[in-house]
């Protein structure tokens, strides 16, 4: 089976990542989807894409240099930017719905503040998810992109604190924590092998 050229493959991937958001937004604008449903759906999809983005390294450690893990690694930036895009739709719906006074008042509450800080961190990550930023920032780029862990903790804190039922958010957080535990465990094993060799 012939492989797609990189531009076509990238375009198809972006289309697949954007389609759910376009469909949800269309239904929301048409009034078919209610505000609460749209807010939940965009936030949940953004959080799930964030998990997939962060799962790439643990999966490579678990399954090695398989073709599908290499494919994921090469598209990790796209997944991260898409996660930010859905977080932005989530925030835009809230801003469109609430008055300025309510927005200012809510921003001081932990449940909402965690979401805003997570969005700002994800904005910085999305804005620097390109080769130009990698070259310009040098070692600082890797340091900056480690703040994805902060964004993840804040994202799931926001989900758990604002949800009527915190269990789904807690389950997603547990999945991410398990993947990160595997990453740390595998990395520690590799370090021991290096020291003993």
For the regions a language model picked out, list residue spans one by one.
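Membrane-embedded alpha-helical bundles that constitute the cytochrome b-like, heme-associated redox core
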Residues: 1-197
């Amino acid at each position: 089976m012939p492989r797609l050229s990189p531009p076509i493959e990238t375009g198809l991937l972006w289309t697949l990542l954007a389609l759910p958001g376009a469909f949800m937004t269309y239904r929301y604008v048409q009034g078919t989807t209610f505000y609460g449903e749209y807010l939940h759906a965009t936030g949940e999809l953004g959080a799930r894409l964030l998990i997939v983005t962060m799962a790439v390294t643990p999966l490579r450690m678990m399954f090695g240099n398989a073709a599908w893990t290499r494919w994921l690694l090469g598209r990790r930036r796209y997944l991260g930017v898409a996660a930010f895009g859905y977080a932005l739709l989530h925030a835009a719906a809230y801003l469109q719905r609430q008055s300025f006074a309510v927005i200012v008042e809510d921003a001081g509450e932990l449940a909402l503040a965690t979401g805003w800080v997570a969005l700002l961190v994800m904005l910085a990550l999305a804005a620097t998810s390109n080769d130009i930023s990698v070259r310009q920032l040098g070692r600082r780029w890797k340091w900056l992109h480690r703040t994805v862990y902060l964004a993840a903790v804040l994202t799931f804190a926001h989900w758990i604190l604002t949800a009527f039922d915190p269990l789904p958010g807690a389950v997603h957080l547990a999945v991410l924590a398990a993947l990160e535990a595997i990453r740390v465990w595998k990395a520690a094993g590799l370090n021991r092998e290096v020291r003993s060799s």
